């Protein structure tokens, strides 16, 4: 068994794992000696046709504990028994999957997808479609991968937007609460008084309503002075005797 290729693997969210070594016995692997691959999708290996597999089978090794932990988390759980991790490397596609062993002694193997044969089938289907009134074509695997990558990117953007809104609202809430409590203290209204909590809630609800447009869009930035001025105006109304 010879070392065929050493990879770094971008697994998403800015995380890159190191020293993914692919070892095999192939005479011609058609893999670079070194490269940077990128995870693009997860697949069910049971649905991977035999013609998509090349003859070469690689065994993965690594001296990195982080790399081992990644594959253990992604491939060794019971629910991931048939999961394959698809990675793109210089317009080639690799599939990482686990070999059936005990969790304490696991082994990760890798194959290169044979897309040449897939494209040959697609060409034959295209030619046959000229005879059929309703042509049937199966999509290229790279098109499927591209769609999955786009879906993942859109999901990441939605999560990022949600986090941005939550942070914006949390900062506003902290500032508003601080201004309201300070305003109540300046007016000599103690927490033990009957109207203390009622005034606080009314003021907080009113200031949220006043800045509802900014809170729904997380923009533009709301300054401390804006919040304090609005709170003072509201407290003058709510504490007027």
Swiss-Prot record:
It comes from the Eukaryota. It comes from Lachancea thermotolerans (strain ATCC 56472 / CBS 6340 / NRRL Y-8284) (Yeast). It is found in: Nucleus; Cytoplasm, Cytoskeleton, Spindle pole. This is Mitochondrial morphogenesis protein SLD7. The keyword Metal-binding does not apply. Coiled coil: none annotated. Belongs to the SLD7 family. Keywords: Cell cycle, Cytoplasm, Cytoskeleton, DNA replication, Nucleus. The keyword Disulfide bond does not apply. Required for the proper initiation of DNA replication. Required for mitochondrial morphology. GO terms for biological process: DNA replication. One of its GO terms (cellular component) is spindle pole. The lineage of its organism: Eukaryota, Fungi, Dikarya, Ascomycota, Saccharomycotina.
């Amino acid at each position: 068994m010879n070392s065929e290729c050493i990879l770094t693997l971008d697994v998403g969210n800015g995380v890159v794992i190191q020293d993914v070594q692919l070892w095999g016995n192939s005479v011609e692997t058609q893999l670079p000696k070194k490269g940077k691959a990128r995870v693009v999708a997860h697949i069910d290996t049971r649905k991977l046709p035999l013609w998509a597999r090349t003859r070469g089978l690689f065994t993965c090794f690594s001296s990195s504990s982080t790399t081992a932990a990644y594959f253990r988390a992604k491939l060794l759980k019971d629910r991931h028994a048939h999961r394959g991790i698809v990675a793109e490397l210089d317009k080639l596609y690799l599939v990482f999957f686990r070999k059936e062993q005990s969790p304490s002694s696991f082994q990760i193997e890798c194959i290169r997808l044979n897309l040449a044969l897939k494209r040959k089938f697609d060409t034959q289907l295209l030619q046959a479609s000229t005879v059929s009134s309703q042509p049937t074509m199966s999509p290229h695997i790279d098109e499927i991968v591209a769609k999955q990558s786009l879906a993942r990117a859109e999901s990441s953007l939605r999560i990022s937007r949600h986090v941005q809104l939550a942070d914006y609202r949390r900062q506003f809430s902290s500032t508003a609460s601080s201004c309201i409590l300070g305003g109540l203290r300046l007016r000599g209204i103690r927490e033990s008084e009957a109207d203390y909590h009622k005034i606080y809630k009314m003021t907080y609800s009113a200031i949220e309503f006043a800045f509802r447009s900014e809170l729904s869009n997380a923009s533009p930035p709301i300054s401390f002075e804006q919040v304090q001025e609005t709170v003072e105006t509201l407290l003058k109304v709510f504490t007027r005797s």
